[in-house]
């Protein structure tokens, strides 16, 4: 039973079902592996990541960056300055505030571990107002790699 649905939620659900039929279990495993890999790398950069256990961050495509409201607002707005959209949340699940990252799209790009390293570094630099030049360089590199995969 679904209530208070929005058209975009239904579209996402339908797309997910189509993807499941077409790509199935392999895609799911890749998506979850990438989520855990990214979470581990972000944790090494000092991000506070929600965990299931010492070694497992998620059993889905989502990872949750736990932050204060002030940190969440700052990080979200910093990312927007670079045309990077993040999913800002203010819920108890996040201990009130945080950022949700999904890895479904990354799984489609077939990125390698070094690309996930770059993504983690990019998010760290954005959150900590790193070098503008370095942020733009990493962002461009990841976009270029994504465009080559199409």
Where are the regions a protein language model picked out?
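Conserved PLP-binding catalytic core of the aspartate aminotransferase-like
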Residues: 48-113
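Active-site C-terminal subdomain of aminotransferase-like
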Residues: 1-70
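Generic non-transmembrane alpha-helical segments
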Residues: 37, 41-45, 74-82, 120-122, ...
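Extended interaction regions within the primary functional domain
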Residues: 5, 21, 71-72, 83, ...
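Short alpha-helical "patches" and their helix-cap loops
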Residues: 26-32, 80, 134-138
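PLP-dependent enzyme catalytic core of the Aspartate aminotransferase-like
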Residues: 95-150
């Amino acid at each position: 039973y679904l209530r208070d649905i929005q058209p975009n939620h239904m579209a996402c659900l339908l797309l997910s079902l189509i993807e499941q039929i077409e790509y199935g279990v392999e895609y799911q495993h890749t998506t979850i592996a990438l989520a855990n890999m990214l979470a581990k790398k972000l944790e090494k950069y000092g991000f506070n990541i929600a965990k299931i256990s010492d070694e497992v961050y998620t059993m889905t495509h989502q990872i949750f960056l736990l932050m204060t409201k002030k940190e969440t607002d700052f990080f979200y707005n910093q990312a927007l300055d670079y045309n990077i959209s993040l999913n800002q949340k203010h819920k108890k699940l996040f201990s009130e505030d945080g950022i949700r990252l999904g890895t479904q799209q990354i799984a489609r790009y077939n990125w390698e571990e070094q690309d996930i390293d770059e993504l983690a570094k990019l998010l760290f630099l954005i959150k900590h107002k790193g070098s503008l030049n370095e942020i733009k360089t990493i962002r461009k590199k990841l976009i270029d790699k994504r465009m080559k995969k199409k």
